[in-house]
Amino acid sequence: MDYELLKRLDPEVFEAIANETRRQTETLELIASENFTSTAVMEACGSVMTNKYAEGYPGKRYYGGCEFVDVAENLARDRAKKLFGCEYVNVQPHSGSSANMAVLFAVLKPGDSIMGLDLSHGGHLTHGSKVNFSGQFFDAHSYGVDKETGIIDMNAVEEMALKVKPKLIITGASAYSQGFDFKAFREIADKVGAFLMADIAHPAGLVAAGLSANPVPHCHFVTTTTHKTLRGPRGGMIMMGKDFENPMGITVNTKNGPRVKMMSEVIDAEVMPGIQGGPLMHIIAGKAVAFGEALQPEFKAYAQQIKDNAAAMAAKFLAADYHIVSGGTKNHLMLLDLRNKNVNGKVAENLLHDAGITVNKNMVPFDDKSPFVTSGIRVGTPAMTTRGMKVAEAEKIVEFIDRVISAANDDNVADVCKQVRAEVRELCLQFPLNGYGLQV
């Protein structure tokens, strides 16, 4: 992208962007929630649609002059419906957290009980964490993974649900490398009269490609981000497989008298005006472009390579005596418990950063360290796969990581990081972004 005007008018901001461009170009991005969008997506996000207010929904705006942003939003909605096989889509949430907030506020009252995967077991802040709105407005209960297997214990989930009688059960995770049995979760939800929501922010691209279980047929609500494995701009989305009359009895007055609102109407109203005002139309345009890209055959090949690369990395880590929580991966990420390597997550993250490899420290189940230190790191393959890297490179990256971790307590660790960084840069330059992300 051409930044000549920015360089001349605001050299300080330009310098920050140039340095970030260099970082993305010359280092390895292994944070599981990050990816590189296409240049086409960035062009849409940087378009004149950033200038337009469009409160409301296509055909029902509170402002005039929305005929062309309506086209973009309808394209995003229609393409998302085709991608995920759903009847209802709202593409206006600014983030995955906003999408989750809208659903929770739509179907719950303050103090209602919810269930979600424990944050320290791989869940997400918005699934009931006490430091988040979801754990402050609602009576949150957390299910977890089995201490031995690292896999969600469905019997324990059912036992908790029967005891707690939640109004909403949330599936989904931010650091769980296995899949979710949505059918089993729905059976539990039906037993206790709960809504079921799947947050597929992480595997959404794999779901869209048909390479991970689709929750749409089983869940009342499905939320996601639009970046991560879906490779779009940063944003959120809400879906329903089938629309239905809201069971809370919320009505709307019509010329024929009151009628029960459809759930889609309740969700739409909770997004806007409930928690948001004007949607980000430039980002929604970017979402439309990304969804169009995800509908192409090449995207399925990309998603398969994400999984292949992750599986290869997991096998290589296990062979090098690393402990992967749950024993392996069925998606795009893995959570490494580093306690047997005598290094904590914070130290590992910092050393790998010095070596040109970006990961994030992450708590592991039953962790005895604080969230600011942690016992593990999370590693993901979406961004490296976007660069065109395959299994051979995935295995080489594990070797890079192992060299750094193995030297963590040695006097020469700085020299090791410096050498690895040079090799990482050389590898990255062999796989330029090629139209994905910023160009230097």
UniProtKB/Swiss-Prot annotation:
Q: Gene that codes for this? A: glyA
GO BP: any one term? tetrahydrofolate interconversion
Q: What is the organism field in this record?
A: Chlorobaculum parvum (strain DSM 263 / NCIMB 8327) (Chlorobium vibrioforme subsp. thiosulfatophilum)
Q: What is this protein called?
A: Serine hydroxymethyltransferase
| Binding site residues for (6S)-5,6,7,8-tetrahydrofolate | L119, G123, H124, L125, S370, P371, F372
Q: What does this protein do?
A: Catalyzes the reversible interconversion of serine and glycine with tetrahydrofolate (THF) serving as the one-carbon carrier. This reaction serves as the major source of one-carbon groups required for the biosynthesis of purines, thymidylate, methionine, and other important biomolecules. Also exhibits THF-independent aldolase activity toward beta-hydroxyamino acids, producing glycine and aldehydes, via a retro-aldol mechanism.
Q: What is its EC number?
A: 2.1.2.1
**InterPro entries the record matches:** PyrdxlP-dep_Trfase, PyrdxlP-dep_Trfase_major, PyrdxlP-dep_Trfase_small, Ser_HO-MeTrfase, Ser_HO-MeTrfase-like, Ser_HO-MeTrfase_PLP_BS, SHMT-like_dom
Q: What is its main location?
A: cytoplasm
Q: Which cofactor does it need?
A: pyridoxal 5'-phosphate
Does the entry annotate any disulfide bonds, and if so which pairs?
none
